[in-house]
Amino acid sequence: MQLTFGSRSGRWLLLGCGLSAALAMQAPDPAPKLQAAADAAQGGKRAELLIHLAHLEVDRATQAYVQQQVAQGAGQLGAAEQHAAAAYLTLQQQAAHGKKNGVRKVEIEVRKISLGLQDLARDVQLEDQSPVAHAAKTFTDLRDHLLSLLFGDAENKGAK
């Protein structure tokens, strides 16, 4: 697997991964602390913590792809998708009770993740794109669902 860094986004991706790797050497792993906080939280706060955990997994996956560890990166993308699904389920249950706490913050984070995954998909080799493209589609679809939770169905708005 080789990454192509001819594009501007590729260079920024490499710089971001290098910076993240340098910071990771200094700081302890935040994932267990985030997971514990998410397990203890409820509602919108739980969803926000879960989506931060998903973003952390996507960052780790990006680093793995840069270091040409494709299997590890694909596994981390799968974990990110699971955290995002749990966050959405939490928000969906909350919305059933008429509450929308945290939906906007989660949607913003999901948009950032989705854009980062689209950049990563452009930079990895064709044979390694499948897990990245799948994760990018998952997060794009999740964002659409979150927007639907926030604003309701656009089709129904036109009928009113």
Annotate the PLM regions.
Residues 17-25:
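Hydrophobic h-region of N-terminal signal peptides that target proteins for export
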Residues 15-18, 53:
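Enrichment for repetitive, rod-forming helical segments
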Residues 2-15:
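Bacterial N-terminal signal peptides that target proteins for export
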